[in-house]
Amino acid sequence: MKASQFFISTLKEAPAEAAFASHKLMIRAGLIKANASGLYTWMPMGLRVLRKVENVVREEMARAGSVELLMPVVQPAELWQESGRWEFYGKELLRLKDRHERDFCMGPTCEEVIADIVRKEINSYKQLPKNFYHIQTKFRDEVRPRFGVMRAREFVMKDAYSFHADYASLQATYDAMYDAHCRIFTRLGLAFRPVAADTGSIGGTGSHEFQVLAESGEDVIAYSDTSDYAANIELAPTLPLKGERAAAQAVLTKVHTPNVKTIESLVEFLNIPVEQTLKSIVVEGENEGELVLLLLRGDHEFNDIKAEKLAGVKSPLTMASPAAIVEQFGANGGSLGPVGFTGKVYADFATEKGADWVIGANEDDYHYTGFNFGRDAAEPEFVDLRNVVEGDESPDGQGRLKLARGIEVGHVFQLRGKYTQAMNVSFLDNNGKSQIMEMGCYGIGITRVVAAAIEQNNDEKGIIWTKAMAPFEVVIVPMNYKKSDTVREAADRIYAELLAAGADVLLDDRDERAGVLLNDSELLGIPHRIVIGDRALKEGNVEYAERRGNEAQAVAIGEIVARVTASLNA
């Protein structure tokens, strides 16, 4: 492709609102153009990258036995009502009516649609298992779209769905699709980790995320320094502490702590280690009017996903209202604790072996020092309530945990009967008996993969594309292409020879200054660059450089095509 026939639109500066490197560089490189908050046009250069990702995905889906179809963007409300997600999904589901006042939505996922198709088309165990996928535009009405295509309202995803006669078949396909996702991200040149994860709004049982490692990632993953264990921090369990509880040394003492409402201010006011404090979180119980008290160390981070699964706790997790707290505790938030509270109390494992805690006294502006479980209040039930921290024992018992940030680019689920039961997706088994199908789903955020790859692969000059994702493999930058016959003839000849060799080449024949052409080639991140100028040609050379770190070097013009093709095939 010649640049004069293509469309290149680069910027020297990124918009002020762009926070992430990927957002800045995608705008500057002209990969995307914003149309509205969270809505983008994929420009020709960006679309080439998107198609490269899709091609790899299609190849690996076919290898895994998944068959492509294409489901609609606009979905009928009755399917979502049947599954129970019409109201549950909340405001992120964009609802609309047609001219006949019938309800529809812009689909953020396609579980309901594919379940409806399968129940109409498959009725016998002889037709199972089946694995379908599509690559389609999705819409999720994010309350605050940000970070460019990383968290946009409109995005492109690969969704695959499998249907089975039994769980063993589901597990086999789940494993195959897990492996397919690993191959996809490996082929795309990404540093990633598969991690055990929560099922979230999709539901089901078993679940793994695929996290691209990046400091800008919104997610935190925990992994063992010894074994293959890895999980999203939301799911990684903490283990009960070993050994005996420390002996109580202090008496329970009520201390006046005026205007002390946070752990930070408590630590400063009493000049104590934060590890000696307990913080109180009050949530609604399952029964009307019941409150549940949750206790964890002041330096630990509360995990609401774990808390929501506790017996007696209302789901979805709901924080107690200030009025309800005052009614049952006699104090406001910031001064709460278990002394005198008669409701259910859970305490985190990390508090079980400690003694002489500092905690709220259930009286505004007062705290207790020297608090001990069993002596000053009944023993709580000790459970896992917090996020893991670096140095915690790995849940598999092998090594210690480390933490890293990641960007979720894929997610696989064992949905089991979540949708097939609700929507009566059934088949006749070999005994002629009706059975509910087992179901799995397997997603990749195609547009997010592009942004995540840039987060991992950039420098001060611009993007550094991996081999599989680059919009072009080679860029030829001729100096004075319009004015120098010698340069133009050499550039055209090398361009033709590389095309004949099967390379994906961009000949930048724009009538621009040399600095613009060179800067754009680096900003766009094309892996291989050939610079052709009159001075080097007089010596029989061209300048060749790889975008990823290699210095430019002179290469004989007669050898450049072989040199580049060898690098492309390496």
Swiss-Prot record:
GO molecular function terms attached to this record: aminoacyl-tRNA deacylase activity; ATP binding; proline-tRNA ligase activity
Keywords, in A-Z order: Aminoacyl-tRNA synthetase, ATP-binding, Cytoplasm, Ligase, Nucleotide-binding, Protein biosynthesis
Location of the protein in the cell: Cytoplasm
PROSITE patterns, alphabetized: AA_TRNA_LIGASE_II
Top EC class, one word: ligase
NCBIfam families given in the database record: PRK09194.1, proS_fam_II
Functional summary from the UniProt entry: Catalyzes the attachment of proline to tRNA(Pro) in a two-step reaction: proline is first activated by ATP to form Pro-AMP and then transferred to the acceptor end of tRNA(Pro). As ProRS can inadvertently accommodate and process non-cognate amino acids such as alanine and cysteine, to avoid such errors it has two additional distinct editing activities against alanine. One activity is designated as 'pretransfer' editing and involves the tRNA(Pro)-independent hydrolysis of activated Ala-AMP.
Protein name in the entry: Proline--tRNA ligase
Species annotation: Neisseria gonorrhoeae (strain ATCC 700825 / FA 1090)
Lineage of origin: Bacteria, Pseudomonadati, Pseudomonadota, Betaproteobacteria, Neisseriales
Name of the gene: proS
